[in-house]
Amino acid sequence: MRQNTILENVTSAQLRSDIPEFRAGDTVKVYAKIVEGSRERIQLFEGVVIKRKGSGIQATYTVRKISSGVGVERTFPLHSPRVEKIEVVRFGAVRRAKLYYLRALQGKAARIKERRRDV
């Protein structure tokens, strides 16, 4: 058996199928499990997806939000069991795959138009 086939068999079992379609510019709610001492709880992180990277089991996405006037970015593995669920709040209309320019913007300048969805 080829090494590539073995690798695909191992990773295909770990891929998640409950992930909604989203891309850079979309606002998402990420419910992440965090461990505090002996307790495990779910922490909500809501913000704009500024990038998606990789494919397969290595795929990641970065979410940016403003918390108490400070920009906070968190990168999550797409297929991580530590992420309980992902909800898409709104679909953003952007023309870039990586939205690093949002780091320099603040207030109304950092707003993203909503993408029209055909029903």
UniProtKB/Swiss-Prot annotation:
Keywords: Ribonucleoprotein, Ribosomal protein
GO CC list: cytosolic large ribosomal subunit
PROSITE patterns: RIBOSOMAL_L19
InterPro entries per record: Ribosomal_bL19, Ribosomal_bL19_CS, Ribosomal_bL19_sf, Translation_prot_SH3-like_sf
A GO molecular-function descriptor: structural constituent of ribosome
Ribonucleoprotein found in the keyword field: yes
Gene3D superfamilies per the UniProt record, alphabetical: 2.30.30.790
Family: Belongs to the bacterial ribosomal protein bL19 family.
Function summary: This protein is located at the 30S-50S ribosomal subunit interface and may play a role in the structure and function of the aminoacyl-tRNA binding site.
HAMAP family associated with the record: Ribosomal_bL19
Official protein name in the record: Large ribosomal subunit protein bL19
Species this protein is from: Leuconostoc citreum (strain KM20)
